[in-house]
Amino acid sequence: MPPKKRGSRIFRKRSSVAQTKAPNLTPPPQAGKATAMQVDTAIIGAGAAGMMCAAHAGARVLVVDHARAAGEKIRISGGGRCNFTNMYCSADNFISANPHFVKSALARYTQWDFVELVDRHNIAWHEKTLGQLFCDVSAKDIIAMLQKLMNKNGAELLLQSTASNFSKHANGFTFDLLSGGKTTKVSTQNLVIATGGKSIPKMGATGLAYDVAAGFDVPVIPTRAGLVPFTFTDGRFAPISGVALPARVSASNTSFEEALLFTHRGLSGPAVLQASSYWQEGAPISLNLAPANDLYEKLRAQRQISGRRNLTKALGHHIPARLVEHLTAELDLAGNLADWSDTRLETLCAYLQDWQLYPSGTEGYRTAEVTLGGIDTNALSSRSMAAKDVPNLYFIGEAVDVTGWLGGYNFQWAWSSAMAAARAIGQKHT
């Protein structure tokens, strides 16, 4: 399916798919008896990547997650409607120490492949903005689709269960599975780690993937919060909390032009979240408060027509009045337009269109949408997501040092990386 024109709205027939739950195919352990289980593939994590992999990884697949329900991050994403991919997804929309790593997986399972899957399951969707595709009805439709595919593949899903004590053996891996108060020793030929990163710990994020990697000597790139609001310890923006405007926010020579929101603790909004993934601690960010126009020329033109007009009122036509009022003392915005020479106006506009700020930090993993860093891609096959030095060990999704922009890119990485691993595993069992 070719890309649609940017900015168009796309609609599909509304979905009537009901949410289903994958069956538990393993009988519960009996008290007092040592139990064991053998599977072809064990997937740790029942999020987007884990479920997608389980649905396509061949027979005898076990999925383990400590959550009460599968796909919890899917459920809450996109305001409950799941921004499941982006029409314009490409390798340029991702951050990684190895920027070429994503190309293979994204090319072999594209955004249009996932759209086709969604269409096959009659899930209604539309483009919201900038190529972002959302469910018309509910994110639960995506979860139901993945669970239906898992059921069809015969995958077993164990929720409120934990995996620990991972070991490598000649024939694969073993780990301890704690489920329903009983411990089972699981043997598996393939082990897939799909537990995500550290973002939003209240949803159950633990960083388990990095612990597993360390246990098998797979290197990990240091992690930090991404797609996250900035904080300022001086509370300077508390008086204008709630003020929003279109702006261009820049960090480390990378700029995003979307909405900016002032908060009690600092800055948020899509433009800020995007820039946060490129920001380095201690470095400045730049705010352009009037990116869509030549502010200097417009103020000069206004001065020529109505020089007695108050400068702050004139600025209020281009920047929210509450923000102008907030800046009045800092920038000495007294007087009428006629009182401001070309030089002073030019200096003022340069300031407003390149406002340099030094964040104290970010809101951290508590509110971060993603985790930057993760499993070092140099240790993985870009074609299969398999660890190069640990046969049959796979890392997929957010656990890997691949972070997408805001707007459906991280879900697409989940689908693409999951399919890369699933296909590699499936080929071994055909």
Where in this protein do the model-derived segments appear?
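Core beta-strand elements of the Rossmann-like FAD/NAD(P) dinucleotide-binding domain
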Residues: 39, 181-190, 256-257
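N-terminal Rossmann-like FAD-binding beta1-loop-alpha1 element of flavoenzymes
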Residues: 41-63, 425
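A glycine-rich dinucleotide-binding beta-alpha-beta segment and adjacent secondary-structure elements
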Residues: 159, 326-403
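A conserved short coil-to-beta-strand element within the FAD-binding core of flavoproteins
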Residues: 159-172
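Glycine-rich loop(s) and the adjacent beta-strand/alpha-helix scaffold that form part
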Residues: 190-236
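A conserved FAD-binding loop/helix module that cradles the flavin
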Residues: 199-212, 216, 402-429
